[in-house]
């Protein structure tokens, strides 16, 4: 660059930093914090599919899917993981349906969890913005976008038309929230529901509520679906679940994770460790027997899972090794995602 231009640029940068504060403008390569801080989702296969080891701090995340597909369970698992790291979490329960007993079963410290049950959509989003601006909250969950009812709709008559009111409310909130979340390094997760577009003959008729603003502002969008039931005899004890990363600004999108959600327990972490361990050749499978470091850990997957549940230290070491293999910068490529996508349909217990 020309010397005069360099001097002019240096003067301009100095003026900007003086006026707006240090770090308000920088060269992209200067900031080593381009490695985005993440929080584990509680599912190893989903962390790998996301490509960064979890969901990113300081960003907006959208999780959507049909009813009873595991959306709230996923957010509660993430809250539990964040609390174990000493982070402060808040749950804005617009649906007024949060079950503290279930949250506690998933490992959430309910004594430390901030909960709000707002009356209107505007109130919910104002609370969300205030928590983000405080700089003291690390994770905010809004459950759900569909339940964020504008004040005008609540105060109006049952048959009144309020065209685009919720979409306008959310669009304004996204503009305000994005910068505040980034400055305070706070993650905001919006749970959303699915609706059907009437008259769509070709393509996917499904859409999410609340207009298009959330789709644009979200750094990560997860589509979670129940694909089957897990049975013990005739009793259903959990769901086979597929989670697709439909948008990802921190790594490559369109990866999928297949996992299990057990009723009252959350993600079947041990089952994921065994499946990925076999794929990465850390666990040997010979017939029905599973072996780790030369020692047999169980006959059949259910017994191997039981061994890992009882031996937490072994499970932690295995988890760390798998993360190093599949998430280290040198090894992040399509292969790690393929391992997750190709995971076998997990056996019934």
Curated annotation (Swiss-Prot):
It comes from the Bacteria. One of its GO terms (molecular function) is single-stranded DNA binding. Its main location: cytoplasm. GO terms for cellular component: cytosol. The keyword rRNA-binding does not apply. InterPro entries: AAA+_ATPase (IPR003593), DNA_recomb/repair_RecA (IPR013765), DNA_recomb/repair_RecA_CS (IPR020584), P-loop_NTPase (IPR027417), RecA-like_C (IPR049261), RecA-like_N (IPR049428), RecA_ATP-bd (IPR020588), RecA_C_sf (IPR023400). ATP binds at residues 65-72. Keywords: ATP-binding, Cytoplasm, DNA damage, DNA recombination, DNA repair, DNA-binding, Nucleotide-binding, SOS response. GO terms for biological process: DNA recombination; DNA repair; SOS response. It is found in: Cytoplasm. Belongs to the RecA family. PANTHER family: MITOCHONDRIAL DNA REPAIR PROTEIN RECA HOMOLOG-RELATED, RECA. Can catalyze the hydrolysis of ATP in the presence of single-stranded DNA, the ATP-dependent uptake of single-stranded DNA by duplex DNA, and the ATP-dependent hybridization of homologous single-stranded DNAs. It interacts with LexA causing its activation and leading to its autocatalytic cleavage. This is Protein RecA. The gene is recA.
């Amino acid at each position: 660059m020309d010397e005069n231009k360099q001097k002019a640029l240096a003067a301009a940068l100095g003026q900007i930093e003086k006026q707006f504060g240090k770090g308000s403008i920088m060269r992209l390569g200067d900031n080593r914090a381009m490695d985005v801080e993440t929080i584990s989702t509680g599912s190893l296969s989903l962390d790998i599919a996301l490509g960064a080891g979890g969901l990113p701090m300081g960003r907006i995340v959208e999780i959507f899917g049909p009813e009873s597909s595991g959306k709230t369970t996923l957010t509660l698992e993430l809250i539990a993981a964040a609390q174990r790291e000493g982070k402060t979490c808040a749950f804005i329960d617009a649906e007024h349906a949060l079950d503290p007993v279930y949250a506690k079963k998933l490992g959430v410290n309910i004594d430390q969890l901030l909960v709000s049950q707002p009356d209107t959509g505007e109130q919910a989003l104002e609370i969300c913005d205030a928590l983000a601006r405080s700089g003291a909250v690390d994770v905010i969950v809004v459950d759900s976008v569909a339940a964020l009812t504008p004040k005008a709709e609540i105060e109006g008559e049952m048959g009144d038309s309020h065209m685009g009111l919720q979409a306008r409310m959310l669009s304004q909130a996204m503009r305000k929230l994005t910068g505040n979340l980034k400055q305070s390094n706070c993650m905001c997760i919006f749970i959303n529901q699915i609706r059907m577009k009437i008259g769509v003959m070709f393509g996917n008729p499904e859409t999410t509520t609340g207009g298009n603003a959330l789709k644009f502002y979200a750094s990560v969008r997860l589509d979670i679906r129940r694909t089957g039931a897990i049975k013990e005899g005739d009793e259903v004890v959990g769901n086979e679940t597929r989670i697709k990363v439909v948008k990802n600004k921190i790594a490559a999108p369109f990866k999928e994770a297949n996992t299990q959600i057990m009723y009252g327990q959350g993600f079947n972490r041990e089952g994921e460790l065994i499946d990925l361990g076999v794929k990465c050749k850390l666990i040997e499978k010979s017939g029905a027997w599973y072996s780790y470091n030369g020692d047999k850990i169980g006959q059949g997957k259910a017994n191997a899972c039981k061994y890992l549940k009882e031996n937490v230290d072994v499970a932690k070491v295995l988890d760390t090794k798998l993360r190093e293999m599949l998430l280290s910068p040198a090894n992040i490529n399509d292969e790690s995602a393929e391992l997750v996508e190709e995971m076998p349909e997990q056996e019934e217990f």
